[in-house]
Amino acid sequence: KKRGAFLVMSNIVIGIEGYVGAGKSAICRELLNHIPNSIILEGGNLYRAIVYSLLKSGMDLSNLKQNMSHVDIKSIMEKLKITIAIENRQTAIYIDGQKIDEEKLQSAQSSLAVSEIGTIANNDKLYEFGRKLIDQFKEKYNVIVSGRALMEIYPNLDYHFMITASLDERIRRKSIQYNNKIDLEELRQNIQRRDELQEKAGYYKIYDKTIVVDVSECENVQASAKKVLSFIKKENIDNEFCE
């Protein structure tokens, strides 16, 4: 965009999807350090908050899952009084005015339930909500979006990344995330089950603009983020990182 004699950069939207345990959330947080005026929208945490609330209320999820194709996720979100805010450039989730910490949202129980419900729910209104949210924040920020089905939610993504890693590496990373408290075989089954559900729902779909980034050999999140940043135009990145 031109304003007078100056060239004004338009804010960009970067979509980060990935296989379970490939480290997309950590990569998003690292990208904040290298993409000026950026924020993270964690789409997955909205779903996790919904499932967390339902689990906490003692609702029978098996009964809910049988009728999920008729359920409007956005209306559930409103009934549970789930709201989203940006704090310290990251997504904060509130349920009935109370902030929910990341550890509760990322629990193994919630994650599997999210995968099961997300594959069969009617997401149209939630996608519409996400689209408006991205447009709203893009007016002021470069937006890094983490989640599933991002090309359906926001087809005009400037970049769409699919983060992959080997199954063994993903198990290793998830084990660290859960402080080695979960049996490795249980973790393997959990990840494989979630992979099956995601693939069945078409969440690992590769589009023409999708850039697949394998981070199996990356020693740390900084190396993973650097691999992602290598595909982003230099004018959108902190100059120091490009040297």
Where are these regions (language model features)?
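N-terminal phosphate/diphosphate-binding loop that engages ATP/GTP or pyrophosphate donors
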Residues: 34-106
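ATP-dependent NMP and nucleoside kinases share a basic, alpha-helical "lid"
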Residues: 95, 100-179
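The conserved Walker
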Residues: 20
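Conserved lysine of the Walker
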Residues: 24
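Hydrophobic anchor at the beta1->P-loop junction of P-loop NTPases
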Residues: 16
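Walker A (P-loop) ATP-phosphate-binding motif of ABC ATPase nucleotide-binding domains
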Residues: 13
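Small-molecule kinase domains that catalyze NTP-dependent phosphoryl transfer to phosphate-bearing small molecules
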Residues: 76, 85-90, 127-139, 147-157, ...
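Hydrophobic positions on the alpha1 helix immediately C-terminal to the Walker A/P-loop
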Residues: 27
